[in-house]
Amino acid sequence: DAERLAEAHRTKDGMIVHVVTADQVYNEFSSGTPDATAYRWFMKMFYDRAVVPGTENTAGNKLPRYLLLFGDCAWDNRMITSSWQGYSPDDFLLGYQSNNSTWETYSYVTDDYLGLLDDEDGASLEYDGMDIGVGRFPVRTATEAKQMVDKTIAYMQNKELASWKNSICFVADDGDNNLHMTQAEELATKVETNYPEYLVNRIYGDAYKWETTATGHTYKQATKR
């Protein structure tokens, strides 16, 4: 399915797309040991080959533009904690966790790190700028992978010009003293101010009734938005 998506981009967008396995990347860039930084070094290889000092702007058509990770990740890459017992690392790609891992609100897993390709980048995720777009399909099975690729290709081939293509949805809950809702609202306001052509929808969990079910808590009304 990864190759099927790559071929769709080659055909429709004229992109040069490489499909590689995680083991291939580990073998070349981390001596065969699974390491999230190996993904970054892999992309930096293409980046360094394209960038000639003093001609970055003129070499832009040769620079790598995107990295798509085809697999889910876990905060416990080694899967040695009880939360991940029973899972196989072979079914996941790795994720990069921030340096501060002692506080839940300051520790996070991010793929942004993989897009920091300049020589001086990587020491500060807060201030370094990404050089490529990084995305991830958080799939764990072949069925999930096929579904994601089917949806993506359907989106690429959809020629219907309607308002749905201009819609942006911000979803947040009230955890961590409303931090997530505050950040979502800041981003939504920035989009409305700088890109008025977009239709911004907000779905904030705390604005809906909290219902308890046999499987846990949910905001049923929010799922209908």
Please state what every model-predicted region is.
Residues 1-225:
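Cysteine-dependent hydrolase recognition
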